[in-house]
From Swiss-Prot:
Residues that, per the record, bind 3',3'-c-di-GMP: F168, P232, D249
EC primary class: hydrolase
A single GO BP: defense response to virus
Protein's job: Effector protein of a CBASS antiviral system with NAD(+) hydrolase activity. CBASS (cyclic oligonucleotide-based antiphage signaling system) provides immunity against bacteriophage. The CD-NTase protein synthesizes cyclic nucleotides in response to infection; these serve as specific second messenger signals. The signals activate a diverse range of effectors, leading to bacterial cell death and thus abortive phage infection. A type I-D CBASS(GG) system. Binds c-di-GMP, does not bind cUMP-AMP. Upon activation by c-di-GMP forms filaments which hydrolyze NAD(+); filament formation is required for enzyme activation.
Keywords in alphabetical order: Antiviral defense, Hydrolase, Nucleotide-binding
Subunit: Forms homodimers; in the presence of c-di-GMP forms filaments with an ordered array of parallel-stacked subunits.
Protein name: CD-NTase-associated protein 12
Region (STING domain) residue spans: 157-311
Pfam families: CAP12-PCTIR_TIR (PF10137), prok_STING (PF20300)
Organism: Flavobacterium daejeonense
InterPro entries found in the cross-reference section: CAP12/PCTIR_TIR_dom, Prok_STING
EC number in record: 3.2.2.5
Activation and inhibition: NAD(+) hydrolase activity is strongly stimulated by c-di-GMP, weakly by 3'3'-cGAMP, very weakly by c-di-AMP but not at all by 2'3'-cGAMP. Self-association of TIR domains is required for NADase activity.
Family of the protein in this entry: In the C-terminal section; belongs to the bacterial STING family.
Length: 311
């Protein structure tokens, strides 16, 4: 599941948008406004509002498209729709995930004063524009930094990951560290590994999905005792060495993402659209990122918890 980026521009700035897509396309899943973004029988605004929620980042290219007179002075300005779309992505994704890259000399709205806006000099060919290539690289580094962080968004993946961590993962790990050993099937274990299985998608009831997965792996269900309550977990171990007890869990709380997406999309049909599936991918990715950050920052968890993908 690659990070998805929307790249917008005016028709006049499309060449630069295409160049940015070319540079970033090897690392991310990039879409131009010309890439079948707009659907038949939907208004431009409705499509934009919906599509903005499907992307992890937005990059808008502000080129010198129009000559505008402001208070008796003439300025080269970007096309109005580019600024509008930047504002839309800014509102949907937040200031750390929406970028506007400005051609030198293009006047931006005064509301953006005080914000550091990447600027570039347009050259022919574009590959010779040192400033453009430098700014693309800076944006790429910022994106790389942001995708390692879990952030609160319109849908609930971050909150669900936090709840799952503190209500299950950290409790189990603390119990593991406070016990001298755990007995399963007359075997005593002193080493442990907790595997969190992230489903490939949300196309089925997660509880049923987990049952099918654990059965396919011939895992044994046990009641894992902690200071607060007993948790049903699935385990396996090497029958010969009986060295490491491997525990498995699939977060059933992920079903809340599916319900939230249905409400957000105002679903009135059976089945899933491509847009619903893209939202699911984004939220699953953010759930995993948030959970991994919490694990890495917990002394009890970081050495025994692994996040794995459903096979």
């Amino acid at each position: 599941m690659k990070t998805r980026i929307f790249i917008g521009s005016s028709k006049e700035g499309l060449e630069i948008a295409e160049y940015i897509k070319l540079q970033l396309g090897t690392k991310y899943e990039c879409y131009l406004w010309t890439d079948d973004i707009f659907k038949f029988n939907e208004s431009f605004l409705y499509t934009l509002l919906k599509e903005a929620s499907l992307f992890d980042f937005g990059i808008l290219v502000a080129t010198k498209d129009d000559l505008s007179t402001i208070r008796d002075k003439s300025f080269d300005t970007p096309r109005d729709n580019v600024i509008f779309e930047f504002g839309l992505f800014l509102g949907r994704l937040g200031p750390s995930r929406a970028f506007v890259i400005q051609e030198s000399g293009a006047k931006l709205p005064t509301d953006l004063l005080g914000i550091t806006v990447p600027q570039f000099e347009k050259t022919i060919p574009l590959a010779n524009s040192t400033s453009l290539n430098n700014e693309i690289e800076r944006i790429s580094k910022t994106i790389d930094e942001k995708i390692t962080l879990g952030e609160l968004g319109l849908l609930p993946s971050t909150v669900l990951a936090i709840g799952y961590f503190y209500n299950f993962v950290s409790i189990v790990c603390e119990s593991i560290h406070t016990k001298s050993d755990i007995k399963v099937d007359d075997a005593i274990f002193k080493k442990f590994e907790l595997n969190i299985v992230i489903p490939k998608d949300l196309d089925a009831d997660i509880k049923k999905r987990a049952t099918v997965y654990f059965k396919s792996k011939t895992l044994k269900e046990i009641q894992f005792e902690t200071s607060s309550r007993n948790f049903p977990v699935f385990v396996t171990y090497d029958n010969q060495s009986k060295d490491v007890l491997k525990l498995y869990d699939m977060p059933t709380t992920l079903g809340g993402i599916d319900k939230a997406i249905e409400m957000f999309m105002r679903k009135g049909h059976i089945g899933k659209t491509s847009q619903q599936k893209l939202l699911e991918e984004r939220e699953l990715r953010n759930f995993q990122t948030t959970l991994q950050n919490l694990i890495d920052n917990d002394a009890f968890c970081r050495n025994i918890v692994k996040i794995i993908q459903e096979e």
